[in-house]
Amino acid sequence: MSESGSCLCGSVNLEYKSEPNFFLLCHCTDCQKATGSPVASIIGIPENDFIISGEVNSYKCEAGVIRSFCINCGSQIYSTAEGAPGLILIKTGVLDKQPSIDPTMVCWTDSKPNWLEIKHPDIKFEKNPG
């Protein structure tokens, strides 16, 4: 298996080979502000399996998450988090093919908009479970 993706303008490309460790839907206010969307769709893969080409810039937020984005088009590509050492957190919107697994966790549901329905109630957390 080899999966790939790119930013909106095509300047940044990524590739990985392993199955995702998890598939997370995050409703925290930081993810909402960073993505401009009510939810961030994220997969976690081992850092040593991540290949990226092209130039990114990064922003570190107070929560200890470093968000990396294309310097040309601004597409969020991936993040790293102090609480998840050794993992790359890829935004699934940049992938050429969406993950074939179901979400494994839906977190920060207390921050989601009221009009957004959670389809996976058995894996939802009002805050971050970690």
Model-derived regions, located:
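A short Gly-Trp-Pro
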Residues: 1-130
